[in-house]
């Protein structure tokens, strides 16, 4: 086993257009096959569409959407005496942000709109209004944690 410990987190640079680390993280989540300029075009286009539809700062809309999607609890598998229990645990802040961004991007890819820009923009707008598949995913995660609350004493 390695003895050096975990690798240090690399600092994220602020996004050049909006000056936000969240937008940088979103670009990195949209990124496929190393095509960063395409990912930036998709994210900036989606944020611009969100600005046109709401008339407010798109970074504020994105933050509101993330707050509605971030999970507070999740279940982790824990093996105890031959049985595997789904143990509810609290989610660290950095992981909750990562999960929220991942869910936003994945569920926007499954939407029916024509372009990825429209899909991402509409998923962000839906999430900021408390609607959409990514918010439903968060609710399902919380329901699973609540249903398995009896195993909470197995937390580690």
UniProtKB/Swiss-Prot annotation:
Alphabetical UniProt keywords: Ribonucleoprotein, Ribosomal protein, RNA-binding, rRNA-binding, tRNA-binding
A Gene Ontology term for the protein's cellular component: small ribosomal subunit
Keyword Secreted assigned: no
Molecular function in Gene Ontology: rRNA binding; structural constituent of ribosome; tRNA binding
Signal sequence extent: none
Physiological role: One of the primary rRNA binding proteins, it binds directly to 16S rRNA where it nucleates assembly of the head domain of the 30S subunit. Is located at the subunit interface close to the decoding center, probably blocks exit of the E-site tRNA.
NCBIfam families: rpsG_bact
Subunit-level organization: Part of the 30S ribosomal subunit. Contacts proteins S9 and S11.
Annotated family: Belongs to the universal ribosomal protein uS7 family.
Matches recorded under HAMAP family: Ribosomal_uS7_B
Name used for this protein in its record: Small ribosomal subunit protein uS7
Annotated source species: Mycolicibacterium smegmatis (strain ATCC 700084 / mc(2)155)
Lineage, broadest ranks: Bacteria, Bacillati, Actinomycetota, Actinomycetes, Mycobacteriales
């Amino acid at each position: 086993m390695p003895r050096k410990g975990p690798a240090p987190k690399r600092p994220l640079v602020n996004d050049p257009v909006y000056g936000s680390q969240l937008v940088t993280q979103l670009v990195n989540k949209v990124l496929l096959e190393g095509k960063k300029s395409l990912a930036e075009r998709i994210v900036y286009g989606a944020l611009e569409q969100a600005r046109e539809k709401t008339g407010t700062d798109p970074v504020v809309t994105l933050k509101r959407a993330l707050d509605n999607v971030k999970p507070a609890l999740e279940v982790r598998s824990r093996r105890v005496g031959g049985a595997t229990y789904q143990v509810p645990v609290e989610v660290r802040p950095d992981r909750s942000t990562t999960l929220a961004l991942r869910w936003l991007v994945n569920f926007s890819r499954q939407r029916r709109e024509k372009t990825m820009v429209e899909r991402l923009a509409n998923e962000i707008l839906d999430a900021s209004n408390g609607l959409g598949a990514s918010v439903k995913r968060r609710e399902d995660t919380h329901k699973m944690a609540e249903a398995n609350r009896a195993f909470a004493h197995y937390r580690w």
